[in-house]
């Protein structure tokens, strides 16, 4: 049954100066991973409940889509609207893909939901000084594009949509960037875990929230023959996807080195959080979210100790 009732957003999380007061700046990296991003949502909600603030977040794909609620300080919003609408045929799935060319509906998932049905708090988002950056992939060059979002308006929402537009099952999103019109797809193709980029931005403390457990290694994409045909007009994206497992695993190696050296604090799933591209069972989303909450609580003391060093 379709639910057309407008949803009144829950109160936002208060900013907590007692947790924020520290000498060094903090940058956080949020990996994507589709609905494994519910894990990230759980971690971030725990942080907000504790009143933790950081100076910058960079999100990729689902990390951008769900991480924006940290800047708007909306505890529980990401898991709430996904559980509410995951069974709605207007939200996502094969029917939406065949009708629109996008796995997730632009008009419903990126317009009706944030503007009317579970309202995104643009006032808090725009007034919060925390830097929020999303990563997209430039279809023409294959290079990552890093875009700071300030207002949370529909243009910002489209940048989030671009960051989460999975190749093959999404159309490129056209947006203006530095005076040029770009065609953009999922940032995970060009820079899946932008720890190196965040380190280059000058933040003294680095934190990464991953969506795969320790020891995970990405394997070559088995569907490359299909992907090559589907993306024959996007050769740079095809090249990225062909070598994505190698770049991703190299990033994991870099993360392990930074973590061992004490230069990076990593939160990763304590158990497997496998998730298909589309989940229609609200309980599956809740289960992944709860793993994130448990890990967020379990690591919170160590996180504060790292930030205080």
Give the location of each predicted region.
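Patatin-like phospholipase
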Residues: 1-60, 68-309
């Amino acid at each position: 049954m379709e639910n057309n009732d407008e949803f009144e957003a829950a109160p936002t999380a208060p900013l907590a100066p007692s947790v924020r007061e520290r000498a060094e700046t903090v940058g956080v990296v949020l990996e994507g991973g589709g609905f494994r991003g519910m894990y990230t949502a759980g971690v971030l909600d725990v942080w907000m409940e504790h009143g933790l603030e950081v100076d910058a977040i960079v999100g990729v794909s689902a990390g951008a889509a769900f991480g924006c609620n940290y800047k708007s300080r909306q505890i529980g919003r990401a898991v709430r609207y996904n559980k509410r609408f995951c069974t709605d045929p207007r939200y996502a799935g094969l029917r939406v893909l065949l009708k629109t060319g996008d796995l997730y509906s632009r008009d419903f998932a990126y317009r009706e939901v944030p503007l009317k049905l579970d309202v995104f708090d643009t006032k808090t988002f725009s007034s919060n000084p925390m830097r929020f950056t999303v990563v997209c992939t430039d279809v023409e060059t294959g290079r990552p594009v890093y875009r700071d979002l300030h207002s949370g308006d529909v243009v910002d929402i489209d940048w989030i949509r671009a960051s989460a537009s999975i190749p093959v099952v999404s159309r490129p999103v056209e947006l203006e960037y530095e005076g040029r019109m770009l065609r953009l797809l999922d940032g995970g193709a060009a820079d899946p875990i932008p720890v190196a980029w965040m380190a280059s931005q000058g933040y003294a403390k680095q934190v990464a929230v991953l969506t795969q457990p320790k020891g995970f290694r990405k394997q070559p994409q088995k569907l490359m023959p299909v992907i090559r045909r589907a993306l024959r007009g996007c050769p740079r994206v095809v090249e990225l996807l062909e070598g994505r497992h190698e770049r991703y695993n190299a990033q994991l190696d870099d993360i392990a080195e930074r973590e061992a050296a004490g230069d990076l604090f990593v939160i990763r799933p304590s158990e497997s959080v496998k998730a298909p591209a589309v989940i229609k069972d609200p309980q599956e989303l809740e289960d992944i979210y709860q793993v994130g909450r448990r890990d967020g609580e379990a690591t919170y003391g160590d996180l504060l100790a790292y930030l205080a060093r």
